[in-house]
């Protein structure tokens, strides 16, 4: 029997943590066992200590996968200083484990969080010579500008990260706009440029199924991280009459949004992944946002489970970004506020959304892309 090659997955976030990145990397790890001996270098079991593990979480990690964990960082990640220090220390800890374990003949798949780890892994790849695949969820330092962060020495950081990205064997973008940005990012850095592939996130079409839309007023819903780049304050300021806005999740901007005291905005707090079907079905239309300037710098993974729930999308964000193209090309919602709200039209858009999730964005279809790419 032929010995399988080792694939190392390097990520701060990994199950049983329930962030979207953890969920994605856990499923990718399970899929890859059919081709590799999979080993994981990751952070602690829970990213946010305020959250509890979900006893109803059905995710099971393949028993053959070896997981090496580093200790967590006890800083407030909702502050800029706390997040920066957490990124630095977590990167150092993950790098130390990688340096001690990864061999030249191995393959590596890492995700771009925490950002400093990209620089360290580029250095390690240059030293050891393993095959380095980078799954790009966020593009640093470009993503600091839309977040309103004034990064000192921005030009120097961009040069260093552009060069680091160019050392990869493959960059995996999660959208067409991101592939465009990555191509520009590495174009002047290296003669042997990395391959750029596009592998979108997937929809949980088995765990999430369409339910009847609620009675009464049209309910607009946001479910996910309430961060600086989501621009939810603008949504609240522009909320049309007779539309309710329900927000699920937590994040750095949660308290400031609550202080707006809008009478038709309701906060429901965090939810478990096992509750997604109930949460995503409790609306007529779901909102996906990206801050101005975020073209190609991130693709909200929540989009695909919204499709699975059979709900249309109202999208606010850069034109020609992946979600903008998806909504307009497939007629599954609106880019900007609609001129009128029609429940029958929302139902038809929702049906198209579910059909699209089943045909193009099933887990099986997306995992086959990962297996072929790496």
Descriptions of predicted regions:
Residues 1-59, 237-240:
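N-terminal subdomain of nucleotide-sugar transferases
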Residues 116-119, 123-127, 152-173:
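Membrane-proximal helix-turn-helix segments that form the acceptor-binding/catalytic region
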Residues 158, 162-194, 324:
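A short, active-site helix/loop in glycosyltransferases that binds the activated sugar's phosphate group
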